[in-house]
A protein has these predicted regions:
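Active/binding-pocket-proximal capping segment
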Residues: 183-190
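Long recognition/docking surfaces used for binding and targeting
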Residues: 3-24
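Short acidic-aromatic active-site loops that bind/stabilize oxyanions
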Residues: 7, 30-34, 196
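Glycine-rich S-adenosyl-L-methionine
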Residues: 190-196
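Short, mixed-charge, low-aromatic patches
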Residues: 3-4, 27-28, 162-167
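Conserved S-adenosyl-L-methionine
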Residues: 33-162, 166, 174, 178, ...
């Protein structure tokens, strides 16, 4: 029996493999979700001038492609690791990325789990280089992607107070359930003056 090594696999291949399995495991009909093709994501990301120190948000992040593509080829520049005199390592993100998605039942909640898994794939090389930072990477994944379960309005239900340098997103186009959204917005005095 041959031992196979799955190291040093190209990120594009990993991403494509992830996307292929993702499309197979998620029923668009049941979830009402459509994921932006990677070529479209890359075209939009390439138009953005992303630099260290920036804060980027995707309020409808899905599996996180708009947030993860910008860091793919700049991991060393955007995620530094420092070592103190005792040899302890610390992860120092040079960029802040925040992704939000909504979900009520277990199937819908899988999206945010898949976003974290996608981030794991993108950062797998760094994690391998710095195995002592596993807990810090897990905290980063959980801090980066947030699931909104309190309302069908998602991030509109609890407005985000943070300011961002850049919003990278492809917001969902909702047909079914739009009357429910309108009803929820009408109940909220702060929202109904902006959305009618």
């Amino acid at each position: 029996m041959y031992k196979r090594q799955l190291e040093n696999i190209d990120y594009d291949f990993k991403s494509k493999l992830f996307e292929t399995f993702l499309k197979e495991s998620i029923s668009k009909k049941n979830w009402g979700q459509y994921f932006t093709p990677l070529k479209v994501v890359r075209a939009i990301v390439n138009m953005a001038d992303i630099e260290p120190g920036m804060s980027i948000c995707d309020p409808a992040c899905g599996v996180g492609k708009f947030l993860l593509e910008p860091i793919l080829h700049s991991l060393d520049r955007l995620y530094a690791v420092s070592t103190d005199e005792a040899g302890n390592e610390k992860l120092l993100p040079q960029i802040t990325i925040s992704g939000f998605d909504k979900g009520f039942d277990k199937d819908e909640q899988k999206t945010i789990i898949l976003a974290k898994a996608n981030m794991l794939i993108y950062m797998s090389g760094m994690i391998k280089e710095h195995p002592g930072l596993t807990k810090q990477f897990a905290e980063l994944f959980n801090k980066t992607f947030t699931l909104q379960t309190n309302s069908i309005l998602g991030t509109l239900a609890k407005p985000i107070t943070e300011e961002y340098d850049l919003i990278l997103t492809n917001p969902p186009y909702v047909m079914s359930g739009s009357s429910n959204l309108k009803e929820e917005i009408a109940k909220d005095d702060a929202l109904k003056k902006y959305f009618s």
